[in-house]
Amino acid sequence: MHAISRTAALLAGAVIGISALAATSSASADSGGVPRSDILRAPLQGSMLTDPPLFGLVRGGAPWVISEGTARLRANGDLTVDVEGLIIPTRGDNPLATLSATVVCNGRDLRMTAPVPFSTTGDAQVVAHVDLPARCLAPAVLVNPLSNGGTYIAATGR
């Protein structure tokens, strides 16, 4: 009788474990079943005059420094870019009214967001959805002045 009770207890434990795993899997997907996991979560760095072109985009015409910045890209294409204190140090402020972000996948697939307000103190937040290719290898995010997709003033990295 003990063997049956022990077997039943093990079976019940296995069912509970599988149920918990299934609940976790469904919780990490959106309503369409697309995983919501991060494919990029990285700090942002201001561009310097010595920085190279990245993915066909050139660095801004002045050096930029940033107090704090992060970019987060989820597998479903949701993008959040937080920028604090992105300024031109020789000016002590940001002269631009708006900025946008460019997501790069596979070293060449670029997707640019709509422009958002960019304060004189260098603060901005981009919250957008971008259509990602089926595979997004080596993702990167670049911050663009105004809606100029050919230039970057900050990029993910260190």
Question: Can you say where each PLM-predicted feature lies in the sequence?
Answer:
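Intrinsic-disorder/low-complexity, polar/charged segments enriched in Ser/Thr/Lys/Arg/Asp/Glu/Gln
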Residues: I66-E68, D78-T80, D123-V127
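Secretory targeting and sorting signals
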Residues: H2-A27
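Mature extracytoplasmic/periplasmic regions of secreted or cell-envelope proteins
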Residues: A29-S31, V65, S100-N106, A128
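Transition segment at domain starts
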Residues: A29-A75
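Helix-rich interaction surfaces within compact, conserved domain-sized segments
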Residues: D109-R158
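Sterically constrained small-residue positions within well-ordered secondary structures
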Residues: A20, A62, R72-R74, G92, ...
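Mature extracytoplasmic domains of secretory-pathway proteins
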Residues: T70-D109
